[in-house]
Amino acid sequence: MKRSKAYRAAAEKIDATALYSPLDAARLARETSSTKYDATVEVAIRLGVDPRKADQMVRGTVNLPHGTGKSPRVAVFAAGEKAAEATAAGADVVGSDDLVARIQEGFLDFDATVATPDQMAKVGRIARILGPRGLMPNPKTGTVTLDVAKVVGDIKGGKINFRVDKQGNLHIVIGKVSFSEAQLIENYTVALDEIVRVKPSAAKGRYLKKVTFATTMGPGIPVDPNRTRNLLEDAPA
C-alpha cells in the first residue's frame, strides 16, 4: 500500500524497534499527525486472552476525565416518560418501534445506544445490525437502564465502551491531537486502569502484550506495556 509523503515523513521520526514511554508516545502522536484536521488519538492494545472462551471476554466502560474530543451521537430506545427524559438529557435520536424500523432501513447515524429494559425485545429484532458494530445495548455496560438521563449524560461527557475483538485486540480513543500531553496521558491511565481491573481470572500469562498509539491516518507508535504507573511525572499541563 502506497503511503503519502506526510505519512512517510512522520514514520521516519518513529523508531519501530523501540518501546516508548506513554508520555513520549503522546508527544510523538501530536508531532507526527499528518492530517489538516484535529486527528483522533487511538490506542490499540493486544491482550493475552482467548476471546473465543466466554470466561476470557474483556469488555467494560470507562469515564475519560477529558472526554474523547467528540460529542458522540446517542440513540435511545424508550417510550413515554423515559423518552422525554432521554430527549431532555441530550439524546440525539429517541424512539421505539419507529427507531427500530429506521435502523432496519439503514439508519445508523449514531455512536452509542441506550435502552430501557422494556424495549429490549424490540431491540432484539435489530441485534444482527447493532451487534457487529458494537452498538447493542447491554446490561453489563450499563446501557440497558431506567436511568436513561444519567447514562446519556455520561456518554456525552466522555464515557466509552471497550470490548476485545476476536483477535484479542482492544481499541480505545483517548482524545484529539489538540489535547495536551497531560490530558492524553490522564485519559490513557484511567482507561488502562479499568482494562487491567477487569482482567479475567481465567486469563493466564502476560495480560498486556502490546500497546500502540496512533493518530488518524498516522503511523503506529510502539509503547512499553509495562509502563502503567507514574505516567504523568514529566507531562506538561
UniProtKB/Swiss-Prot annotation:
The keyword Ribonucleoprotein applies. One of its GO terms (molecular function) is structural constituent of ribosome. It holds the Pfam family Ribosomal_L1. One of its GO terms (cellular component) is large ribosomal subunit. InterPro entries: Ribosom_uL1_bac-type, Ribosomal_uL1, Ribosomal_uL1-like, Ribosomal_uL1/biogenesis, Ribosomal_uL1_3-a/b-sand, Ribosomal_uL1_CS. Keywords: Repressor, Ribonucleoprotein, Ribosomal protein, RNA-binding, rRNA-binding, Translation regulation, tRNA-binding. CDD domains: Ribosomal_L1. Belongs to the universal ribosomal protein uL1 family. This is Large ribosomal subunit protein uL1. The gene is rplA.
